[in-house]
Amino acid sequence: MVFLSTKLYLWQMKMLFSEKYRPQKEEILKLIDSFDKEGENLGRGDRNVIKIFQLGDEKINIKSFKVPNFINKVVYNFFRKSKAARSFEHATYLINHGIGTPYPIAYLEENNPLFFGKSYYISQQLEADCTFRALIEILREFTAFTHKLHENNILFKDHSPGNTLIKKNGNQFDFYLVDLNRMDFKNLSFEERIKNYSRLTSKKEMVEIMSDEYAKITGKSYDKVFDLMWGLTAEFQRKFYRKK
């Protein structure tokens, strides 16, 4: 535990580092201290801030999660793992099962006896060749990658175009998942597996390619796969645009 300051309550920092990066712990903590003023912005949304920092001869990615609302400050302090902790644990699980994701370095949580505060997830910065959105021609390989997730009892709930990084490796492509805090680990039914493809695209021709590849991999009927995948995709699109 690292004690930060005293105002009303004593704030402390809980942290967990991967064994590989423990020797660089102090350097990483200095980067966290300078997070608000330094670093290269990678993305700044309404909820989270992502920055790139130099650590020795490599670049690392630090994601600062938005401080939760009053109720969730209590929930995350006592009852539920933080998004930072889940991201670290999920990344470790993926790495251990041969699934690509930027290597997890550490997570840190700031809290006091009553409330949860800031939290950070740190990983290697992966310089991707492209994202899923930019490479229609690799749909078949991506379909097989998603099937591999399911065979390892992994349900990536945020399986959407922006959360898959792609690197070219010779004549094939390697896939890396990011934004890992929403995952389940369980046996998946056929419908749950197919539904996991439903957020990836609204283009029928792409769904046809994924359905064809999925049918070849699993031995299931193409018509059965396509009818379910396209139906679930259309249902997701209706719900998505209804919210707008």
What are these regions (language model features)?
Residues 1-40, 233-237:
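Juxta-kinase regulatory segment immediately upstream of eukaryotic protein kinase catalytic domains
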Residues 28-128, 147-152:
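Conserved ATP-binding subdomain of kinase catalytic cores across diverse folds
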Residues 153, 158-159:
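Conserved catalytic-loop position in the HRD/HxD motif
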Residues 173-244:
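C-lobe/activation-segment region of protein kinase-like
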